[in-house]
A protein has these predicted regions:
Chain A
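Secreted/periplasmic proteins
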Residues: 2-149
Length: 149, 292, 200
């Protein structure tokens, strides 16, 4: 597992940060998603333009631990807006924080590429509604750029 | 059978010591207190103090069981604690089904049938201890009253003891078996024996070692496609997922909708060079076709 | 179908008639899209996206799916020739069955119907620890719930970070954390695997 010292200050403070994005379901749902619940903010729904962020609180950070992958991210709370831009297509979506996640440290060092552009580490998870605006749900994982909206 | 009953306080005390020390000393367990069902019961802010309180209670009962003389009250306290565990587990499985129990250590799995079985076994051991414990004689210390119910139960135990004596059960073997069963029911220990065992079996049996497939899975081609510069150049215009694919002349053709046009990609079936993927946009509306 | 495939094949391999070069499309390049992102988003962040639907198919009539959303809102989804359907891979319309879960993206019509561009049937994207591997199945611990994940020969692949996808899933280990993208078998805790994403 590629673990290294976290960057200081947070990588996303001064400008956009690149990482991997996946999607997750939340709210009322079918199948294995039905037990997920409405997320850490209590507002999460698969059909809304929302996302999960690894640093919404101390408790959240202790679960996701992006610092173990060498990435420090700013504390952003429920409702904060990020813009996620697919690195190759340039398609983007602005979403609001509704949950804590992803568990960055469990996939430390993972890399996704598109053309000559690559991004490391899972830094954000989108709801299906948001993810499907910038990529196909069947792709599962894409490299993106994340910035404050 | 007397030997089995006499050994139960030590078995129970062992597990209570383990549980109590983990709750009081494990920093990781305190860090994860917020994710246990106890946090749901006590409120997240009071999860750590509640964990410590339960730990102290477990240590106190363990000490009472270990320090002679063994009193009926000690066994009753152990039985009440075990019954409390069962009630707590039932609460956890209903009120916080996704939370871990925070019983003997740190693991994130929620309460399952094994946790109930372990708590039930501990309760049975505590009851056996209570029934096998002679109440203290009046004037010899703390009061102990034998109720009619207990007298009846004791008579039952004695009858059972006689029957068991007839079987001449090897007491140490039964106790070892009991401890092994209790340990095996502890999900907290799975990573030390169950996971390595499963890994070993997987290594020996190689269950997923599939014979080489003649056909390249579509997902493998799509992964190469998504990594390609050709896909990058056209991805912003794609409006659908894959509409149609077919294989021809060593290439896999993949068709997407691109608004009122069709995007067709040619992905080599052999090799792993994203640069070899080609794309064209055809000025005709997409038609869905049967997948290859 | 054959002749159409010939047209598409010759277009991508040899510049047949009717081909529009990607560069000639102008707006398709990423630079243009990055510029276009400055335009305001139609839907407020955090709000439900009207061009997206989620739920389970109640009935199918002609080319229309009647879907009951998990939030108990009904959606009428129209599937046309240009609509892609996914169910462990691209499938024709007749693969859709009542009871299937779905996500759909398209364009919401004034009459409330969703004209679908993409429909994903039973798609799930779950993360968890592999509890056990036996036969052609993985037992996944997903948020404390066991999900039985089936390897489908010829379809399931594993992606180990940067390595090319492989149909050989024997590198997966008990207790490792993975992401599984697959198709749920309705009303069960079972999933057919499309892709296993493994960080190592």
């Amino acid at each position: 597992m590629a673990r290294s010292k976290a960057t200081d200050p947070p990588a996303d403070l001064l400008g956009p940060v690149q990482g991997e994005v996946s999607w997750f379901c939340c709210g009322t749902a079918w199948g294995p998603c039905s037990s997920t619940g409405k997320g850490a903010c209590g507002t999460c729904n698969s059909g809304s333009l929302q996302h999960a962020w690894p640093n919404t609180s101390d408790a959240c950070w202790s679960i996701t631990r992006p610092d173990r992958c060498g990435v420090s991210l700013s504390r952003r709370t429920c409702g904060y807006r990020h813009r996620v831009t697919a690195l190759c297509s340039g398609a983007s979506v602005v979403t609001a924080i509704a949950d804590c996640g992803p568990q960055t440290d469990l996939f430390c060092g993972e890399r996704s590429c598109c053309g000559a552009t690559c991004a490391d580490n899972r830094l954000i998870d989108l709801t299906p509604a948001a993810y499907s605006q910038i990529a196909s749900l069947s792709s599962g994982l894409r490299p993106v750029e994340i910035s404050s909206a | 059978m007397h030997g089995i009953a006499a050994s139960q306080p030590y078995v129970i005390a062992f597990f209570l010591l383990w549980a109590g020390l983990m709750k009081l000393l494990s920093r990781r367990m305190r860090a994860q207190a917020g994710r246990t069902a106890l946090a749901r019961l006590s409120g997240p802010a009071r999860a750590v103090p509640a964990l410590r309180l339960v730990g102290l209670g477990e240590l106190a009962v363990a000490a009472a069981l270990l320090l002679p003389p063994l009193h009926l009250l000690d066994a009753v306290a152990a039985a009440l604690l075990s019954a409390g565990f069962l009630v707590y587990l039932a609460y956890a499985s209903v009120a916080a089904p996704a939370s871990s129990c925070g019983c003997l250590g740190t693991h994130s799995r929620p309460v399952d049938v094994r946790a109930f079985a372990r708590a039930g076994l501990l309760l049975a051991a505590a009851l056996l201890t209570a029934l096998g414990t002679r109440p203290a004689a009046p004037g010899a210390g703390a009061p102990g009253t034998v109720t009619g119910v207990q007298a009846g139960l004791e008579a039952g135990v004695k009858a059972g003891v006689k029957a068991a004596d007839g079987l001449a059960a090897p007491v140490p073997a039964v106790i070892v078996l009991e401890v092994i069963v209790l340990l095996a029911l502890s999900a907290e220990l799975d990573r030390y024996w169950l996971t390595p065992l499963r890994r070993l079996l997987v290594r020996l049996r190689r269950p997923l070692a599939a014979p080489p497939q003649e056909r390249v899975p579509l997902e493998a081609s799509l992964h190469l496609l998504r990594r390609s510069p050709a896909y990058c150049s056209a991805a912003a215009g794609l409006t659908s997922d894959v509409l149609e694919t077919w294989d021809e002349d060593g290439m896999r053709f993949v068709v997407y909708g691109a608004r009122d046009r069709t995007a067709v990609f040619a992905v080599p079936l052999s090799g792993d060079d994203p640069g070899a993927v080609r794309v064209a946009l055809v000025a005709e509306p997409p038609l869905s076709g049967s997948p290859a | 179908m054959r002749s159409r495939r010939d047209v598409l094949r010759s277009a991508v391999l040899g510049g047949g008639a009717g081909v529009v070069a990607a560069t000639a499309m102008g707006s398709l390049g990423p630079e243009a899209a990055f510029a276009a992102q400055k335009t305001a988003q139609k839907v407020e962040p955090g709000a439900p996206d009207p061009d997206f639907a989620e739920g389970r198919i109640r009935s199918i009539k002609d080319n229309t799916l009647l879907v009951l959303g998990s939030n108990l809102v009904f959606h009428t989804i129209r599937v046309v020739d240009g609509t892609s359907l996914w169910k462990l891979g691209p499938v024709p319309f007749d693969a859709a069955r009542p009871g299937d879960g779905l996500y759909a993206r398209g364009v919401r019509m004034p009459d409330g119907m969703l004209a679908a561009e993409s429909v994903w049937l039973n798609i799930v994207n779950i993360r968890g620890h592999i509890k056990n591997i036996a036969g052609q199945t993985l037992r996944l611990d997903h948020n404390g719930h066991e999900v039985l994940c089936h390897v489908v020969p010829g379809k399931s692949v594993a992606i180990h970070s940067e390595s090319p996808p492989t149909a050989d899933l024997s590198m997966l280990k008990v207790s490792q954390h993975v992401q599984i993208l697959g198709a749920w078998r309705p009303d069960t805790n079972e999933v057919d695997i499309a892709t296993v994403f493994s960080p190592h």
